[in-house]
Amino acid sequence: MNRTLVILCGGDSSRMGTKKALLPFEDKTMVEYIYDKFRPFFDKIYLSVNERGDLTHLNLDAQEIPDISRNAGPFGAILSCLTMISGDRAFFMSVDTPFMDPRTAVLLYEQSKDYDITTFNFNEACSDTICGVYNKNCIGTLFKGMFFKKVSNSFLQEKCRTNLIETSEIDSISTISMEQQFYKVNDRSSYYYAVFSILKHNFIC
């Protein structure tokens, strides 16, 4: 299998008011929900955290990687993790997208071998979504982008060898729509909606 997953669990969670990773979700926390769902599809799982030890009490078989800088955002977390993972690349996803189907991650992973970045050709509404396979070849570009304070999805995709997969391919491997898979739990109202959707079995994968 030889696949690596990084779940981005850091950030200040200012809109939520508490750590998203530890929000109750079904009978576990949100990060545990994602971990359990993706574990059968990945050999190695890392947790990107603000500080080492943030999620140790969950006793997951996953190595924590603290951010290089607390204020560097998701791209700082990606950079931190790429410098620490054992393999040459990893699939990155945010902890606030718990409805993503693991088969979607596998779809990208299988098409990432000869590229620095493999992600979806998102529409404008999802243009800031962090979801894709990033290779260690991105490290230099990430450093430059952060130094000059202009790092973004568009910046990275322009500077790196990027493979953009059409989102329509999701339909061939998953019964969960793209809109559902990339639904973001980023504030209280979206969290409550997600919890009730689980109870009603609206989002299941």
Write out the residue ranges for each language-model feature.
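Nucleotide and nucleotide-moiety/phosphate-recognizing core
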Residues: N2-I139, F143-K150, E158-Q180
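Glycine-rich phosphate/pyrophosphate-binding loop and the adjoining helix
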Residues: I170-I204
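A eukaryote-biased feature capturing mid-to-C-terminal, repeat/solenoid-rich segments of large proteins
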Residues: Q157, I204-C205
